[in-house]
Amino acid sequence: MMENGIWKDALIQSMKKLSPKLQVKNPVMLLVYVGAILATSLYFLGFFGISDEKAGYTLAIALILWFTVLFANFAEAIAEGRGRAQADSLKMARKDVLARKLKNLEDKSDVIEVASNDLKKGDIVYVLANEQIPMDGEVIEGAASVDESAITGESAPVIRESGGDRSAVTGGTTLVSDWLVIRVTAVSGESFLDKMIAMVEGASRKKTPNEIALQILLVTLSIIFLAVSATLLPFTEFASKQAGAGSAISITNVIALLVCLAPTTIGALLSSIGIAGMSRLNQANVLAMSGRAIEAAGDVDVLLLDKTGTITLGNRKASEFLPVDGVTEQELADAAQLSSIADETAEGRSIVVLAKERFDIRGRDFAEMHAEFVPFTATTRMSGIDYQGNTIRKGAADAVRAYVSANGGTYPKECDTIVSKVAGAGGTPLVVVRNNKVLGVIYLKDIVKNGVKERFLDLRKMGIKTIMITGDNPMTAAAIAAEAGVDDFLAEATPEAKLELIREYQREGHLVAMTGDGTNDAPALAQADVAVAMNTGTQAAKEAGNMVDLDSSPTKLIDIVRIGKQLLMTRGALTTFSVANDLAKYFAIIPVLFYGIFPQLEALNLMDLTSPTSAILSAIIYNAVIIIFLIPLSLKGVKYREMPAGKLLSRNMLIYGLGGLIAPFIAIKLIDMLLTVLGIV
């Protein structure tokens, strides 16, 4: 907790937070703050003989109340200090640099140098290797390696290029190679880096709806206890006269009783719990645009997960050559390798490697063959090679069928059987055709990640439904979904289908989370309750999401849900503990405080506390000290366990509810004994 001097800064901030302007933000602790001021005033009145209050006792109460306020300030300051430490490293990346602003896009020598802080949206800048990108933007020309370690912590450079889903760049990152022409999409103060700094510092953190609702409950309880405490002075004065025994309660004891009964424990820690939750998300390299998004993550019960990269490893691998009748496996492998020689994808390279391993088929002299490679396009959905009068194509089954038919050939039914078999096994079939004759099928296998099935099982135990999103055909999607253990799948997914699926679940009352990186994902991201945009994605995707994953890892969504649930669990557990504490303190203080007037209350003095003075001091010391003991838990969070909500609630009620009842009885009695031994009371 005490990393690199954060505690020193927290101590200083704790004192600064004694300002009334800051104390007003926390109504429960404001009550303690006012109580401390009143007790201090009563001490001076008693010291100079103006009041009947015992000066020494009143001073002790006043000091303990001031420490209670300071401990609450310290909890918040520690949480904020962690954020500031994180923000300081980010600020080092935010420097005002000179940018080359292009006057004419066609002439890159026609530039004017302007400060990055003076750039406006729509300005075009030209950035060269080893220069810092001056402001957030969209690459409109060029391709280059970019070092984003200042923001993501990842040392390996990433590729940024115009077009596609890798066109967004972030101000403060550095070009490692080549050059880029960038259209500025943010102004100074509104950049991605500025938002990150504001969020981790807590400067822009607003209270979430759940926080506000809980604070209203705590304030209501405090007002009730305030009203009860205010009536005790006239009530005990009247009761003591009627009983002819005892005496009226002192104002100091009324203040102490009010502070003990008010929900000060959770009131002191509520802010630090929220800040720490945001900090845990930042440590996972995820930037949340609001605390509401983190809370929503904790309530999510439907996860939409991309197949590639999340459920499967992402690189399909050639595992078999399946020829049709009349064609040998080696003949198919030879044609498949020729069609893949110029294919730079992982799938293409795996086909070349498999042919080499199975049949020792080596490279050829393509210059001598007068070979012409045909690249894959979204229109043809095929790639291949033309050489010495021969034509080889490989691609999706329906694309090859259309190609063969268009060229007057015959597509064998046997090939359909092989394609169905491969798809049914969860693989991707690529059909190979040479000179308009179908040779067979390449079996590309999708490899499901290790341990993913167990993770989905844990999510199911928690009541979270998992849905795999894939562009594969329904048969392939069903096979992979069964192997991975997801609850459902959406095959041949389009942006419109994803958007409609989210709306359908939301109409049924579910909270939906999803990830996305492309402009076509933006509508679905905007609709989802928790929308995690990839940092490598487009500007449109980032703006549509309410979180950004700096690591651009699709599996991070599961971790985000875990952090959200941990935040809600921590707040609920400490609220339960605080309320249970108040109940225990009630039994500790009330009987001892009033048995002089009502002797029957002696039977309720379960802890056999020495005296009313000792009881009050013991309870109020415990009330302050317990805040310090709970600060690590509020920052670290309650340990998250994958189990149904009902079991989780029962477990936490047992630990924090029953624990909250027992702990004060033991601690207050021990403090009472210590005060007695030391002769303080």
Swiss-Prot record:
Catalytic activity: K(+)(out) + ATP + H2O = K(+)(in) + ADP + phosphate + H(+)
Catalytic activity, EC: 7.2.2.6
Major subcellular location class: membrane
Record: residues binding ATP: 343, 347, 376-383, 394
Domain of life of the source: Bacteria
Molecular function GO labels: ATP binding; ATP hydrolysis activity; magnesium ion binding; P-type potassium transmembrane transporter activity
Role summary: Part of the high-affinity ATP-driven potassium transport (or Kdp) system, which catalyzes the hydrolysis of ATP coupled with the electrogenic transport of potassium into the cytoplasm. This subunit is responsible for energy coupling to the transport system and for the release of the potassium ions to the cytoplasm.
Protein name as annotated: Potassium-transporting ATPase ATP-binding subunit 1
Organism: Listeria innocua serovar 6a (strain ATCC BAA-680 / CLIP 11262)
Lineage: Bacteria, Bacillati, Bacillota, Bacilli, Bacillales
